[in-house]
Amino acid sequence: MRQTAQDYINELEKCDLGLEYQCVNALQKTPWRINEFVVDTLRLCWDSGQEWEGLPPRDNLSLPKYPFSKEPKYLNEEETLKFKIFKSERNKIHSYNNKSMSKRIQIERTIQLAEQYKDIEKLWYVWQLDFRGRKYPVESFLSPQNADYSKALLEFANPATITNDEEAKWLAIHGANVFGVDKVSLEDREMWAYMNVENAVGVYNDPLTNRWWQEADKPWQALAWCYEWALYNNARQFG
């Protein structure tokens, strides 16, 4: 039987949604802040005009030129076939350019928001839930549920300090996961992270020159991880 929106609302009024409200409120009470290392690096990368994994191209692809000197209605059978291929390729590039334009607007807006708020100590999000109970932040650009670079721009405003090897293990495992090393045991992931301390420190020192983080499945979250992993291991080594 098909239900109307009002039927659904009437049904919800009979339910105990206390736990759902608690979940939403817990999310809304969680403070965030901007990761300055990531936003500064992202701005430099985006403005460089170079190709970076996880970012759209800065410029549109060139559309192919009409390959014949006569109008389509005068083409022979072989030329007509080539013309159809030309139109198909042109349409694909045109569609790709339109999508890229939308992505460029999104990333520029996201960077601008991050730069606007990077000096603010704590940020909070307004959250909503849908009919399935899934929770989403209302903000559509700079969001912990958005693109890889958007997630990397955010960190908890009340971070937990790593105090022992067991806690460090989970930071190591996170690093392996964002690099795509997630089909091996947790122990192997931890080992992988320690084997790549030097790479992480190199990224920490100069992320534009040392592009190891660009090899990751989630490159911008990998960049954020390199920063944290380098800080942790530098502190462990030098105190």
Predicted regions and their residues:
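Non-catalytic nucleic-acid-binding interfaces of large nucleic-acid enzymes and RNP effectors
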Residues: 1-239
